[in-house]
From Swiss-Prot:
Sequence repeats: 1-17, 26-43, 70-87, 95-112
Keyword set includes Repeat: yes
Protein name per its UniProtKB record: Cuticle protein CP1158
Modified residues (Pyrrolidone carboxylic acid): 1
Cysteine-cysteine disulfides: none
A single MF term (Gene Ontology): structural constituent of cuticle
Amino acid sequence: QVGYSGIVSPDGNNIQFTHDFAHSIVLKGPSGIVTSDGKNLQLTAGQASLQAAAPAPPLPVSHYVASQQSVVGPSGIVSPSGNVQFSHEFADNVVLVGPSGIVTKDGNNLQLRA
């Protein structure tokens, strides 16, 4: 992991930055560190892979759909006309719940009824 005071390498070794280097850091990017004095640091492939790890996708949030008087949540839909329980596979495939539908990772989106 790359931080503002040093690097924990994939092999577990710690690299401590000097006080001057740490205070000159302007930006940490996926492949290196940019400093105000031009003494930039290029990360090794192993160090860069720690920075490039994909963040966990956001969890779907319960969403109130006013036109339907329904609540769409991460595990299903509760509506006056009946409830729909999502399968584990479908729930894991959800990217975004919006007022008119659900966007999925595989492109098989679900249109909500008006």
